[in-house]
Amino acid sequence: MRAVSFWLLAFGFWLTSVDVFSQERGGFSLEQKNDTLSVLTLKTDSTCDRWELPYPVYQFCTGDVDGDGSIDAMVGVIKSTRYFKEKGRRLFIFKNYHGLVRPLWMGSKLGGILEDFRFTDGKIQSLERTTDGKYVVAEYRWAHFGMGFERFLLKNVTREEAMKTFNN
């Protein structure tokens, strides 16, 4: 596994430093072409398929999201949606469908205002901001067509408190 650090420029200001990992687990890797274009690649023994992501990327990880035994790719992108016109952090999940990169879920929203996510123990753990400026750490699990809320690990706390739980 190799890491490449870069700064994301979005909305006219620098957001954060991000490490994008070229993970070979499941054959998925992510390459940043420029500030607003990344390419998700799936390499198998017999195929190589690519999916262009014309958005800034803030997170990338892999794991078996839907429990089917194959590795999926989770990509955090910054974009607006049909229902949420303001640009925000979104979660896209891609699967390996016979050696091809195919969308599993391109959700417009989890629960709150998504800041970050990770994949642990078959669940997506999220760091989210609420409309009143508080923070929550929540867990989601695949629920047939999309992510289903499991539980709050922490809620109605400061960002610093939420980060401690999220980073452990």
What are these regions (language model features)?
Residues 1-18:
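Short, basic, low-complexity termini and linkers enriched in Ser/Thr/Gly/Pro
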Residues 18-168:
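Beta-propeller-forming repeat regions
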